[in-house]
Amino acid sequence: MLGVVIVSYRSDDLTVRFVREELAKVTIPHRVVVVANGYDAARAQQLADRIPEAVVLPAENRGFAAGNNLGVKWLDEHDRPAHILLTNNDIHFRSERVVETLVETAVSHPEAGAVGPEIIGPDGNRQGPEPYMSLWDRYVWMYLSTPFLGAEKKRKRFALDYPSRAEAGSHYKLSGAFLLVDAKAFREAGRFDERTFLYGEENILSDRLARIGRKLYFDPSVTVLHDHGQTIGRHHGDRERALMQFDSMACYYRYYRGYSALSIAAARTLYSSILKVK
């Protein structure tokens, strides 16, 4: 039995489409749990009526990490699957046997705590994998260095082409938009850190898995399309979304990478100013 968790936030049509059109292609016996963030029981039941093949859980909107954890805990209590697919609802399969292949890869690489496919955006570019990047590189020097570095030097300095060059194997960070986790490893690692709201979960998961000796494995033999930001883009502007990302990543840098609160506050002030003139 495979577990599948979808965190849905006011995007019923996307969720219904994904369950009926994409997950219907999965040949492995599976149980789908939809965590309906921001819905009460009555509103969640309306969604459940449209996808009777799924379990729909109403939930307070405490973010992506908490929503996924809720779905995973339900699966652990009811089915105890060996693997759980954590997926957005704005995903389209671009290969045959996507999920089946990821499960096979996970089984053949027992060191992997999570396995991800090639994920491309609407522009055709890969969304990961990514290397580690420091707080200041990610949010300050990346932008302030532009007048001083040519395109080629900037590409090398910040490894901007890392996703396009990435080959099959272990990498620091994989996208959480479509990620197969080893249920036991995910549980032992402490699942996602619920202090984050949106963004930063994958970085923290990478560190948590590393602490128990597990890795993230990239399998580009199968591909999915991620219509990135289709949901959040309807509810938040670009600057608001960027600062939301920073605040979640601040949790990662503060508690997992040892940055001081003062350093993070200074970086946020500079980053906020940069966003105003971008």
Can you describe what each PLM-predicted range is?
Residues 58-78:
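Glycine-rich, basic loop-to-helix element that forms the pyrophosphate-binding segment
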Residues 11-26:
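Short, well-formed alpha-helical segments that are part of the catalytic scaffolds
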Residues 92-129:
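Conserved donor NDP-sugar-binding/catalytic core segment of glycosyltransferases
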Residues 164-166, 172-223:
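A short, conserved alpha-helix in the catalytic core of glycosyltransferases
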Residues 134-171:
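Short, flexible, basic/aromatic active-site loop/helix in glycosyltransferases
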Residues 80-92:
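Short beta-strand-to-loop acidic/aromatic patch adjacent to the donor-nucleotide binding site
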Residues 12, 34-45:
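A conserved acidic beta->alpha catalytic loop
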Residues 206-278:
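Active-site-adjacent helix/loop segment of glycosyltransferases
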